[in-house]
Amino acid sequence: MPQQTDNTRNASPDSASAHPRPPSAQRDSASSGKPVLPIFPGGALPPPESAARKAVIRGVALLALTTGALYLTWRALASVNLAHWWVAVPLYLLEVHSFLGLALFTFSLWEVDTIPAPPPVDETTAKLAVLIPTYNEGVEILLPTIAAAVAVRLPHETWVLDDGRRPWVEELATALGARYLSRPRNTHAKAGNLNHALQVIDADFIAVLDADHVPLPDLFRKTLGYFDDPRVALVQTPQDFFNLDSFEHENADVTATLDGALDDEERIRFSEQTLFYRVIAPGKNRWNAAFWCGTGAVLRVAALRDVGGVATETITEDIHTTVRLHRRGWRTVYHNEVLARGVA
């Protein structure tokens, strides 16, 4: 039988900080020697690109494509050494492959401001839940995430889905005002954990957070408006990271500003994944190609159930589930605003 505790729906966004930490959690945190992770303020939606900026970027892209096409034409007609074709032809095909990658990149990013962000939702009759799958994360990781999830605005339930079946996690979740759920076996890992929760919870929309991703209070307020379109199944937000000592941020200092080195807030905004989450992902909205990135996403439960739940056949259950949703005619959206921050 699944184990679950605490059936209280979180009605007050400010009540989480009043919950004491359980004694076992305090001991675990002290023994780890690691501080509880801070919760940084979130980012904001980037301003729309100006017409002049778009024109310059598109002009440079077209110039690059034209130059590349002329170069490949010259290579094919005058430069490929057919006397040594076993070297020359594969090399030429690699160059063609690179050019096609540039063309596809330009095509997908030609227009990125295609879906205006809806106004924040201040009240809703929908049933909401935040799901936090966990297996072996320590208290210094779980505590900030659970506390912040309980404090997310709009009435909702917070569920800690513990595949580690740890009594202290149940104690921590209960103390912070969250519900606790475990299962007898860890079949299909995270995907199976989420599918098990879908059989238990009563929700119209769920926010899925990795155990190390701390949500910001407006996670639901800024994303629920997209679901006014009954075809929308998923809203994905950027993945961002608040610890500055990881490989994600190791190149931040080489990015200079007019004032010199980046300050901490600028370093927080810069990581290895900035190109994808701030440039490439927004361009996918035009083609209904946004996909679930595993965390920081809000999903329509009815859509998940329509495709048989979270895909379990591969370890990339997020993208696989998105493919299933698209196959069934559902739409997906990328909301280009940081609404959760994690540990890299």
Task: Give residue ranges: language-model regions.
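N-terminal membrane-anchoring/stem segments of glycan-assembly enzymes
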Residues: 2-122, 173
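Catalytic donor-sugar/metal-binding loop of nucleotide-sugar-dependent glycosyltransferases
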Residues: 313, 322-340
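A conserved acidic beta->alpha catalytic loop
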Residues: 162-169, 185-186
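Long helical/loop segments within the catalytic core of UDP-sugar-dependent glycosyltransferases
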Residues: 108, 181-205, 217-315, 326-327
